[in-house]
Structure formats: structure tokens, C-alpha cells
Amino acid sequence: MRHAEVSYVDSAGAPVKPEEVPLTAAGREQAAAARDALAGVELDLVVASDLPRTAETAAIVAPGHEVERWPELAEWRGGRLDAIPPDELETSFVGALQVKDEAQRFLGGESLGEALDRVHPALERLLARAWHTALAVLHGGVNRIVISYALSGDRTYFGTFEQAPACLNILDLGEDGWIVRTVNYVPYEPLHPARTTTMEHLWEQLKPFLDERQ
């Protein structure tokens, strides 16, 4: 699943460090909805990245379980927005997770190829563990990498599906390979009334600050 809602801007609209943000009040409610959706599921293993927003989500969704924190499963690392030409910034930002070439970089930071090199070995290490049902609380970009691997079995990356806050993805792995059962199920809004992507929503939050800076 993806972590629940956070805010990447402070009360004044200025960006905050993404590696430090906690869940919002709405995010905690979203995580509780995911917990309720999984109430009948017996979890053998709970994994999160090393960032607070995934660990906090995991603690709400799977109370009583130890949460293993894996830094290799942190979100794609972006670069500096001021290094992107202003006339290209909006297009680059809202399409940052829809890259097609391994050399393309996430907002000027980590490339797709580098992210694959980091996430795929961690996924294989997770699969080598002995468990029946595991919960991995991760990030939108990392989830896309994992689901793409389940669909393709190789380094193919599909960036054009959405990962809403606190969404659930259900993947099975058996002797005959992967079965992708559910992608982007949102317990608190199952019909997806929002028409913006998560990156478009984040752009709307950041744009006033970026406009003032120019």
C-alpha cells in the first residue's frame, strides 16, 4: 500500500523536507480506513521504508505488529526544482512518475534505472523471506516499480496508473508467477471521485510558493 496523506508544505505554503513530514489528520483517518479494510487479514510480516510517513501509516494499519524499516524502499529521490527551467517545471513535475527511459531522472534527481537498481534487489530479498501474507507500506513511485515488476517480470516500468494516499494493492506470488489482483483500491473513496493525480495535487500546493519565488 501507499502511505496515507501528508502535506509537503507548511501553514505558510512553503515546502518542507519530504523526509520528515508526518501524516495529516486526514491521513490518519485514511490509514484507519485501510486498517478496517484489512481487519480480517492475518499478517505475518509488516515492512515500511525508513521514512516517517510510511512507518506511521504502518503503525495505524497494523497495530501490534513490529514494523521493519527498509531504507532501500524509500521514495524516488528528487533533485532541486530551481534547476528545472521555469517554462518546463509544471510539465516536468506533474509527469515526474510517468518516465519511460531508465536514464530519465525524477525531478532532476534519481534516475529510473537507479531506482530500479535499488528497489528490485530489496523486493527479491523480501520475497526470499518465509511468510504467507505481508504488508508493505511504501510510496507511489516505489509501488509503481513493484507492480510493474509483477506485471512484466523484468525492468519494464509502467508509470501511468495512480497510487492514491493509503491505497491498497493486492499481489499474489505462486509457483506459476505473479497475479495482480487489485491496484489502487482506496477504502475511504472506492469510486475515486478526485480527478487529479497525486502529483497534480502536490503541484497545486507548491505552485503559489514557486510563483512568488520567480
Can you say where each PLM-predicted feature lies in the sequence?
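Loop-to-helix element that buttresses phosphate recognition and phosphoryl-transfer chemistry
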Residues: R2-T57, V61, R105-H120
